[in-house]
Amino acid sequence: NFGAPELGVAGAAYASVVSQVAGALISILCFFRLYGRIHISINLGKDGYSQYCMMLLPVVLSELFWSMGQSVNTYVYGHMGTNELAGMSLTGAVQGLTIGALSGLSQAAGIIIGKRLGSNEYDKAYDESQKLCGLGLIGSLILSLLLILVRNQYVQLFRVSGDVRTIGAKVLVVFAILMPVKVQNMIIGGGILKSGGKTRYVMMIDMMGTWLIGVPLALLTGLYFRLPIVWVYFIFSQEELVR
């Protein structure tokens, strides 16, 4: 640690904040180096503000209600037991890593398809959206297979009980099975549809999937029927299929 004091969990929190601030500063610096000085104005006109809000508000609400849904799921895990919550937390890092590895396709879809639509090249936009979905499917299948193969080695990296490792390994299998569906939703909903301005449509899909299917299933299976955590995770994740 190069002579620095051991901070434990607080140190991890400090490191996260510092890394995020550093990343933001680097992005701002690169932006100004590429484009020089820019003139910032918030005067969009009446029609501009209206259109901006119509596009932005559904995105904000969608992310807000999705985050609230994830909080409810965590609440369910916590009330099922310490091992269950620890097992789910164990998989968080690798889930974020694998989804993050393919999130670039969603961002690329938003840029590429948006550019084609802006140029009125609708046929090319459709063809390229299919190609991006295909790449996402292939990539997610490969990562799913790798994740299933190394799941036991991954959980062995943590100093936890055998029960927690068992739960974590099983949850990773379920996540790997559902990953292709998650990635397709990410590319189509988060990239293709939003690039076409269908933000309200995406918001409705996300809210219905989360609050009409995912959250009720999590509450029923986890708190009422008291099913094992692996089955709870598998059942409420079927919201991805509905989306």
Each model region followed by its residue ranges:
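Short alpha-helical transmembrane segments in multi-pass integral membrane proteins
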Residues: 4-57, 113-178, 221-243
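Hydrophobic faces of transmembrane alpha-helices in multi-pass small-molecule transporters and flippases
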Residues: 17, 26-29, 44-72, 76, ...
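Transmembrane alpha-helix boundary and packing residues in multipass membrane permease domains
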Residues: 16, 29, 59, 63, ...
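Small-residue-enriched core segments of transmembrane alpha-helices in multipass membrane transport
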Residues: 93, 207-216
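Membrane-helix interface segments
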Residues: 8, 83-84, 199-200, 228-229
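Helix-terminus/linker motif at the lipid-water interface of multi-pass membrane proteins
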Residues: 1-7, 60, 64-97, 115-116, ...
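Transmembrane alpha-helical segments of integral membrane proteins
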Residues: 1, 185-189, 213-222
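Small-residue-rich hydrophobic transmembrane alpha-helices
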Residues: 74, 85-151, 183-202
